[in-house]
Amino acid sequence: MLCAVYKSSRKADTYLFVNKRDCFDDVPQALLEMFGVPQLVMVFPIAKRESLGIADIQKVRAALEEKGFYLQIPPPQVNLLAEHRESLGIKD
């Protein structure tokens, strides 16, 4: 199975995986509106891949089979200053 990956024109480091290039039929309209104009990044055979950058390959495959798409959002940023202040017992 081929998988097409698109990056969001509105949200940084947000990617949408779909089963077919330029086929967004399974993606909810509200998600597409939030995502903005999809910009093609790559098309690859997902069955041959053992891993992906950030996303869990098994979760991506399962989502593509069940829902027809997978949305990858960036992990939350860690506030190192807040963690350090908390470790020192400093409260705002």
From Swiss-Prot:
Any Pfam family the entry gives: YcgL
The protein, known as: YcgL domain-containing protein Shewana3_2381
Source species of the chain: Shewanella sp. (strain ANA-3)
YcgL domain span: 1-85
Residue ranges the record marks as coiled coil: none
InterPro entries, sorted: YcgL-like_sf (IPR038068), YcgL_dom (IPR027354)
